[in-house]
């Protein structure tokens, strides 16, 4: 019986023998295609090959493509675990032809592979063709399929198109008949939705182009796109009707069972299936650079994670489980997908962190859900407001709540949920609008109507003439900004860069050409009206400015130069991080200001000193290389074809600006290709050497799964190093040491200080035990309620020393109770102890709570033999002792 790994290899090797190039799977995050959430089919990485934009050195390709369907219209999440063939992650086997072979070869290839290499009985196979595709019908007859098993289908199921317009064509599909013991009919029959006949391969004949009027013409370059689900064909070849019975899933399910100590094939099987499937999608997404977050791809990942974690909870798991299963997954799939092994530590850390955090709210959220359902009539849907509270307060995605309700035979009021979500967004918008942080956006569309789109000249010049076409003062259009007044100036053209893409806006001056003494100081520049209007925030330093005035606009050159250096350094930093940490690194945000740069990126843990050093050295290496920074304008498709990185969620027009820099000599791209290629609208240096130098200040956590690096370039970096050098000189002078000796000298001083602190602490404890540190309450033992009781107020003793003193007093007393109060700058630390023979009569917790209350504090807790707490007023120590005595005497 072949394993899934064997089946994958057989498929790829068959097509390699037929002249196909084996192309590695593309990442689950589509390269430079912000229109697509996840890679969901084999043809995604070849989209531009089919349109002729991407010219490759092969015309035949075969792949095993990683795919995820868990968002948007391709969303299998709700059904995963409950059916035999739904998955969030799956592998799509495919063969492709880009203008090379067509139907007469594609169909025989498929038939030979499945009947000879896979040895599937021919009498179990049916095929479908589009109802007008006589050519495909005849080819199927020629390879030996009886006419009775070739079914013409007139629906869109057998006609594929890339979109409303563009490449399209008929499909042919291959179905397997599992036998009459399973209900269902062949495709095209009334019973086709049954499980007897299962599609195992789809072949698309990309032969037409469709236009807006619905008409179609034949393409000059006819192509082939096929897809066969590995899990589905694997189940068939392993003699099963259920994908979860294949060798890979069995291994993952058994690992889940071992981790939870729950039978993998009993009543709880569905939970193991969910965990096994979701482990695959979450692990591969993390390996490909997606990290859990509250929006976009990261939120889809978090939804999948939390659904799996809830099913682990239903299995009774008290501790995080998912991260313990990654090793098994890597063992099963790491050979085929090496990126999984490279990212294993990151995957495990991310899963552990996310599961630990979610478990803190999972129990409370499920209790709220149960309480809400208990209060409802039987079978009534959960109100949308309650589902929204679970989402907003406890982090329950709506589909997780729906999944939990499904098991109880209940539903959720999704309209009510949507209404609650819309209400919250409306409140957030209102709060934002009232914050004073932004001028009402509507005014800028009025400005656009008046002034038109601004022509940006800043890539080529920092000084230009223009005309003030619109002025905005106090949120309204105005004809004039008076001397000393402030407002916004919009000109027909400008060299000022408007804040966007992480780069701050330019500053500078605007002068009236008619009277150059009339000067407006530009404090900021921004883009409004969907980026079409560039507005300058000004204060009139001298004179006034009127609508229609001819003006000269001049950018602050020194500031712009510093910003350019930081922005270019950010591009180099991005690539250096990817090389040092892995391809999972993806930009999550940035700030390119004049004085510093900040870069947020996906990574689950702090960088080591060695990694930080490597990243800094790599950036400086490319700065010293002094290579030319190139910018080109091209279509988004052309940009993607050359490997330019784009940000998911960014909107791109018909043309994009591509910034390239650095020539790789070692490591990634060592063949001399460009090292960094990104879609970017910002301003950059002309040569990487213009950055000067790069100093990495440190790495910190920005949010869950996102790290932040801050750095300096140019003069700021030089000044920082000079200051650090001066500080080091001061330290070496104080220590009378050479710079290389400083670390060891400081370490010795710290060790000495710690030893002295321990000695002082021990002396204080000895003094306290001898009675010398006592004040007020004394240290004599006396009986209260028949219990030997010692109470003492201590000064110069820290609260953390009290438990050790309690234990020593108890040991000396043999039997009794102790109350110690440490005066710490007016506040009090309290500890109480009771010997084991008396804990049935009196609890140290009760003594502490009484004392803490008298000291103006709240709470206090611990064990019957030892408890601690704190109070606000150490001056009330006598009252605290009396309160404890009342507990003993009561």
Curated annotation (Swiss-Prot):
Catalyzes the attachment of alanine to tRNA(Ala) in a two-step reaction: alanine is first activated by ATP to form Ala-AMP and then transferred to the acceptor end of tRNA(Ala). Also edits incorrectly charged Ser-tRNA(Ala) and Gly-tRNA(Ala) via its editing domain. CDD domains: AlaRS_core. Zn(2+) binds at residues 567, 571, 680, 684. It comes from the Bacteria. The keyword Transport does not apply. Keywords: Aminoacyl-tRNA synthetase, ATP-binding, Cytoplasm, Ligase, Metal-binding, Nucleotide-binding, Protein biosynthesis, RNA-binding, tRNA-binding, Zinc. It is an enzyme of class 6 (ligase). SUPFAM superfamilies: Class II aaRS and biotin synthetases, Putative anticodon-binding domain of alanyl-tRNA synthetase (AlaRS), ThrRS/AlaRS common domain, Translation proteins. Consists of three domains; the N-terminal catalytic domain, the editing domain and the C-terminal C-Ala domain. The editing domain removes incorrectly charged amino acids, while the C-Ala domain, along with tRNA(Ala), serves as a bridge to cooperatively bring together the editing and aminoacylation centers thus stimulating deacylation of misacylated tRNAs. This is Alanine--tRNA ligase. It catalyses: tRNA(Ala) + L-alanine + ATP = L-alanyl-tRNA(Ala) + AMP + diphosphate. Belongs to the class-II aminoacyl-tRNA synthetase family. The gene is alaS. Binds 1 zinc ion per subunit. It holds the Pfam family tRNA_SAD. Its EC number is 6.1.1.7. One of its GO terms (cellular component) is cytosol. SMART domains: tRNA_SAD (SM00863). GO terms for biological process: alanyl-tRNA aminoacylation; negative regulation of DNA-templated transcription. GO terms for molecular function: alanine-tRNA ligase activity; aminoacyl-tRNA deacylase activity; ATP binding; tRNA binding; zinc ion binding. The lineage of its organism: Bacteria, Pseudomonadati, Pseudomonadota, Alphaproteobacteria, Rhodobacterales. Its cofactor is Zn(2+). It is found in: Cytoplasm.
């Amino acid at each position: 019986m072949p394993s899934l790994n064997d089946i994958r290899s057989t498929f790829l090797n068959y097509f390699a023998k037929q002249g196909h190039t084996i192309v590695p799977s593309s990442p689950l995050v589509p390269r430079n295609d912000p229109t697509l959430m996840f890679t969901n089919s084999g043809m995604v990485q070849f989209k531009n090959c089919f349109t002729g934009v991407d010219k490759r050195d092969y015309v035949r390709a075969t792949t095993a493509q990683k795919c995820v369907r868990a968002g948007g219209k391709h969303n299998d999440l709700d059904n995963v675990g409950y059916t035999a063939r739904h998955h969030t992650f799956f592998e799509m086997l495919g063969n492709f032809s880009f203008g090379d072979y067509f139907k007469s070869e594609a169909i025989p290839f498929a038939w030979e592979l499945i009947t000879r290499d896979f040895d599937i009985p021919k009498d179990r196979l049916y095929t479908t063709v589009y109802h007008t595709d006589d050519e495909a019908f005849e080819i199927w007859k020629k390879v030996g399929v009886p006419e009775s098993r070739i079914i013409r289908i007139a629906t869109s199921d057998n006609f594929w198109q890339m979109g409303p317009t563009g490449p399209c064509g008929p499909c042919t599909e291959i179905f397997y008949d599992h036998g009459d013991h399973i209900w269902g009919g062949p495709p095209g029959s009334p019973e086709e939705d049954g499980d007897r006949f299962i599609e195992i391969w789809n072949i698309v004949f990309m032969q037409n182009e469709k236009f807006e009027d619905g008409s179609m013409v034949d393409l000059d370059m006819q192509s082939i796109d096929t897809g066969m689900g590995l899990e589905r064909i694997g189940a068939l070849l392993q003699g099963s009707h259920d994908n979860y019975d294949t060798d890979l899933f069995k291994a993952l399910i058994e690992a889940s069972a071992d981790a939870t100590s729950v039978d993998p094939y009993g009543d709880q099987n569905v939970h193991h299936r969910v965990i096994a499937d979701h482990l695959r999608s979450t692990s591969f997404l993390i390996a490909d650079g997606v990290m859990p977050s509250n929006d976009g791809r990261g939120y889809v990942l978090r939804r999948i994670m939390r659904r799996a974690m809830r099913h682990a909870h239903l299995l009774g798991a008290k501790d995080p489980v998912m991260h313990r299963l990654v090793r098994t997954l890597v063992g099963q799939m790491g050979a085929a997908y090496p990126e999984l092994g490279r990212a294993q530590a990151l995957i495990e850390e991310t899963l552990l962190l996310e599961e630990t955090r979610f478990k803190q709210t999972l129990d409370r959220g499920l209790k709220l859900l149960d309480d809400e359902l208990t209060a409802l009539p039987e079978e009534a849907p959960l109100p949308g407001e309650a589902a929204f509270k679970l989402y907003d307060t406890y982090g329950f995605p709506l589909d997780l709540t729906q999944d939990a309700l499904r098991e109880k035979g209940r539903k959720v009021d999704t309209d009510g949920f949507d209404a609650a979500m819309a209400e919250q967004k409306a409140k957030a918008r209102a709060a934002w609008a009232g914050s004073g942080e932004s001028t009402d956006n509507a005014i800028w569309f009025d400005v656009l109507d008046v002034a038109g789109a601004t022509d940006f000249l800043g890539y080529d010049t920092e000084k230009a003439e223009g005309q003030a076409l619109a002025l905005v003062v106090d949120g309204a259009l105005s004809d004039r900004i008076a001397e000393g007044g402030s407002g916004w100036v919009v000109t027909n053209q400008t060299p000022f860069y408007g804040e966007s893409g992480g780069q701050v806006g330019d500053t500078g001056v605007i002068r009236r050409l008619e009277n150059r003494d009339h000067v407006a100081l530009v404090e900021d520049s921004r883009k409004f009206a969907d980026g079409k209007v560039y507005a300058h925030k000004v204060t009139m330093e001298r004179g006034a400015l009127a609508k229609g005035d001819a003006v000269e606009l001049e950018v602050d050159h020194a500031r712009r130069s510093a910003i350019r250096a930081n922005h270019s350094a950010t591009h180099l930093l991005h690539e250096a991080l990817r090389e040092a940490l892995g391809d999972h690194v993806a930009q999550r945000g940035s700030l390119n200001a004049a004085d510093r740069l900040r870069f947020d990126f996906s990574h689950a843990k702090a960088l080591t000193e060695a990694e930080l050093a490597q990243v800094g050295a790599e950036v400086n290496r490319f700065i010293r290389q002094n290579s030319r920074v190139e910018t080109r304008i091209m279509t988004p498709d052309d940009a993607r074809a050359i490997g330019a990185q784009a940000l998911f969620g960014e909107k791109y027009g018909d043309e994009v600006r591509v910034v390239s820099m650095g020539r790789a000599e070692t490591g990634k791209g060592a063949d001399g290709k460009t090292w960094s290629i990104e879609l970017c609208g910002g301003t950059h240096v002309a040569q990487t050497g213009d950055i000067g130098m790069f100093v990495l200040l440190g790495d910190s956590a920005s949010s869950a799964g996102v790290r932040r690096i801050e750095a300096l370039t140019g003069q700021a970096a030089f000044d920082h190093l000079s200051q650090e050098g001066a500080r080091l000189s001061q330290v070496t002078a104080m220590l009378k040491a050479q710079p290389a000796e400083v670390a060891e000298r400081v370490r010795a001083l710290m060790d000495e200080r710690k030893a002295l602190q321990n000695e002082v602490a021990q002396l204080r404890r000895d003094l306290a035990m001898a009675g010398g540190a006592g004040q007020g309450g004394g240290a004599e033992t006396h009986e209260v309620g028949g219990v030997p009781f010692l109470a003492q107020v201590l000064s110069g003793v820290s609260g953390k020393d009290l438990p050790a003193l309690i234990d020593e007093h108890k040991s000396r007393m043999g039997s009794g109770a102790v109350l110690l109060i440490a005066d710490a700058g007016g506040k009090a630390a309290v500890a109480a102890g009771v010997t084991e023979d008396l804990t049935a009569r009196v609890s140290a917790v009760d003594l502490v709570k009484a004392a803490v209350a008298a000291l103006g504090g709240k709470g206090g807790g611990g064990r019957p033999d030892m408890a601690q707490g704190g109070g606000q007023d150490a001056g009330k120590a006598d009252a605290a002792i009396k309160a404890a005595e009342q507990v003993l005497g009561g």
